[in-house]
Amino acid sequence: MAVKIKLKRLGKIRSPHYRIVVADSRTRRDGRAIEEIGKYHPTYNPSVMEVDAERVAYWLGVGAQPTEPVLAILKKTGDWQKFKGEPAPAPLLQPAEKAARPSFEAIGGEDEGKGEAITQKKKADKRDEAAAESSASEA
């Protein structure tokens, strides 16, 4: 049986998420997989590539062939170089640490409203007009 390591697409339209799977080469892209060995989320910045290196090494060792996109991912993570016995690539880009944001109270924010809402003023005006009309009709 010819085995391939390929991407299985998940997610909505224009929001792809992939699982790196080991499957028979004759199965459909999103068909049944033998084993899931990783994840790939290209829309995140930087993109997320999680690969189970031990299982990748096993499947490459028993003859599984990676597809071109999976081969590119394996080269970025360094698993392909480890399998071939070559030096590892430079480390991947890691997301930057976000600076601590000051709390709302520390900035001087107040928890008070700006005053009455516009709709309440309109209702008050209508009540005043109704009271003026009723007093005018009585007089």
From Swiss-Prot:
- GO MF annotations, alphabetized: structural constituent of ribosome
In the record, the note on similarity to other proteins reads: Belongs to the bacterial ribosomal protein bS16 family.
The protein's name in its UniProt record: Small ribosomal subunit protein bS16
Which portions of the sequence form the region Disordered? 84-139
Question: Per the record, what is one GO cellular component?
Answer: small ribosomal subunit
Among the GO biological process terms of this entry, one is:
translation
Listed NCBIfam families: PRK14520.1 (NF011093), S16 (TIGR00002)
Q: Which InterPro entries match?
A: Ribosomal_bS16 (IPR000307), Ribosomal_bS16_CS (IPR020592), Ribosomal_bS16_dom_sf (IPR023803)
Pfam families listed in its UniProt record: Ribosomal_S16 (PF00886)
Record-linked PROSITE patterns: RIBOSOMAL_S16
Record's keyword terms, sorted? Ribonucleoprotein, Ribosomal protein
Q: Which organism is it from?
A: Streptomyces lividans
Task: Determine if Ribosomal protein is one of this entry's keywords.
Answer: yes
Record's keyword annotation contains Ribosomal protein: yes
